[in-house]
A protein has these predicted regions:
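Extreme N-terminal basic, low-complexity initiation segments
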Residues: 2-11
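Intrinsically disordered, low-complexity segments enriched in serine/threonine/proline/glycine
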Residues: 12, 18-19
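Tryptophan (W) side chains
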Residues: 14, 28-30, 35, 40, ...
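Glycosyltransferase-associated regions of secretory-pathway enzymes
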Residues: 51-118, 136-317
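Intrinsically disordered, low-complexity polyampholyte segments enriched for Lys and acidic residues
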Residues: 22-24, 32-34, 53, 179
Length: 317
């Protein structure tokens, strides 16, 4: 069964047209006022086409700005090597990616908002080469060959804006620049795997290329990706979904950490942990420091009491 999305559909059509006549049989029939095409391919051709649509064994990550990789990022990359042996790991930075490729990327780079540069870069690289992508704060804890073998994938997270609004951290929501109202978001940074030429990525690239300027308050890659997937049929339900040729996995697969509390809930499905370093947020703001302090207190005294005290304080502030 082929994933029906623009990229794979077009590749399949060209694949059929390029094959010698003796290696395929094409039958047309007229049924209920519509033409239907039945194509028979030899088993070797099916195998070849499947191989062309497999996710390559490459792990991509982005690191713009020229600073050395922090220790936490190095540990995460080491976990990729441990649980995904045999994969080539490629870093993308100023030396091998054009940061002037479009106005959005150029202005984000000039503003030193490197996480937003990587939002575009990951899609361009994956559309061209295919493979896996992880943010540098993603720790892999189990082998995920079964997920890669199942085809193109992304994963859900609970919207950071929704979580912060539940806390009452309105100032942090504004500083973050993400849009509210999404109980679930599809976050490409958690883990993203695709074969080359996926149509969904082409649409995302076109979206970014059409933006005349970069502005943090316009939204994040989670907002843009989720909105596009909704146009393709994504529903607001926490379950595994197939949308636009991509499997969207539930939160527990790639995002077991609660970004509000820092609590990690592992299940048998969990293959990685996103540690939410949030490099795109100003870590010097009072609201962010308060958010981190609350997480540490939850770790010491438990979520129930700290959240209760937090709600009481908010009512009297």
């Amino acid at each position: 069964v082929l994933p029906i999305c623009r990229g794979s559909y077009i590749r399949f059509c060209w694949f059929i047209l390029a094959m010698p006549l003796e290696m395929k049989l094409i039958h047309w029939c007229w049924y209920e006022k519509k033409w239907y095409c039945y194509i028979w391919l030899s088993p070797c051709l099916w195998l070849l086409f499947i191989m062309l649509n497999m996710i390559p064994k490459i792990i991509h990550y982005c690191w713009f700005g020229g600073n050395p990789l922090p220790e936490d990022a190095q540990k995460c990359i080491a976990s990729w090597k441990k649980y995904l042996p045999g994969y080539e790991i490629k870093e993308w930075n100023e030396s091998n990616f054009d940061v002037n490729c479009c106005p959005y990327v150029r202005e984000a780079y000039q503003a030193k908002k490197y996480a937003f540069v990587s939002d575009y870069a990951r899609f361009e690289v994956l559309y061209r080469e295919g493979g896996l992508y992880f943010d540098t704060d993603v720790e892999v804890i189990r082998n995920m060959d079964h997920i890669v073998a199942a085809g193109n994938f992304m994963a859900f997270e609970k919207s950071l804006a929704t979580k912060l609004q539940e806390e009452g951290s309105v100032s942090t929501v504004k500083a973050v620049g993400v849009k509210s109202g999404l109980a679930l978001g599809v976050a490409p940074g958690l883990g993203l795997g695709v074969a080359p030429g996926l149509g969904l990525l082409h649409e995302l690239l076109e979206f970014y290329q059409a933006k005349e300027h970069f502005a943090v308050e316009d939204g994040t890659v989670v907002d843009y990706t989720t909105a596009l997937l909704r146009k393709h049929g994504l529903v607001e339900e926490h379950r595994l979904q197939q949308v636009a040729g991509v499997t969207i996995y539930p939160v527990d697969y790639f995002c077991p950490m609660d970004s509000t509390t820092g609590i990690i809930t592992l299940t048998d499905n969990t293959v990685s942990i996103h540690h939410y370093s949030c490099s795109w947020i100003d870590h010097n703001t009072f609201s962010w420091r308060l958010h981190i302090l609350k997480n540490k207190l939850i770790g010491l005294f438990g979520e129930k009491w700290i959240m209760k005290i937090s709600r009481i304080l908010k009512r009297h502030m």
